[in-house]
Amino acid sequence: SMTIYDNKGWVVVNNSHVIFAIDLNTFKEVGRIENLTSPRYIHFLSDEKAYVTQLWDNRIFIINPKKYEITGYIQVPDMTMESGSTEQMVQYGKYVYCNCWSYQNRIIKIDTETDQVVDELKVGIQPTSLVMDKYNKMWTVTDGGYEGSPYGYEAPSLYRIDAETFTVEKQFKFKLGDWPSEVQLNGDRDKLYWINKAIWSMDVTASHVPVRPFLEYSGTIYYGLTVNPANGEVYIADAIDYQQQGMIYRYSPEGKLIDEFYVGIIPGAFCWK
């Protein structure tokens, strides 16, 4: 993943156990943080403090971005190193919320003053995304695991969670065998998008998921999704077959194709400057 902070791009490379800080104009490295386990996402609390989630580790790392140093750890309860999985983070007041994905079923709540997990909320099997809308409602979608999984297999769901009370307000259920992922918000944070073979969209105040998708499934592999925060245009990454160059499609907010272009192999994430 990549996050922009302090006029730098922070590129989190999980397989290389490192975070690179790069110049946004030249893409040249200006610093790095090493000795991470398998970093996934970074969330900045201040110029001198950030959290880094991990795969295959039961700790969230605390780092000092100015010094490019690891300064501490947050131990996640009831999680082993082998089953460790923390992912995306959102913040409400002094609390940071994080979804626990691989062989997990929880959203955890972290007090940023004490760097301790103070609460957790159980959802379905393997919550894959976490975003916060304009009404301070968190959204996560579960993938339901897979058939034969030792952790279980169930129909996935989309959840709306109130950040103030840390309770589930609404659960939107999918069919067994569906594989929803990549929950995103538009710039106004009042419209939700996600992938479930097709591309789907709905208002954050909706009472049910739509019957028709925003974009129909075309037999390809939609692998990444983002929405331009300035104009609402939707960008979709197509992995095609995981072997050749991927394709990016750009659509208007009304679902009309504007542009398409090739990128590298398996495009999966976007970052807006």
Where are these regions (language model features)?
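Predominantly soluble domains enriched in secretory-pathway, periplasmic, or organellar proteins
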Residues: 1-273
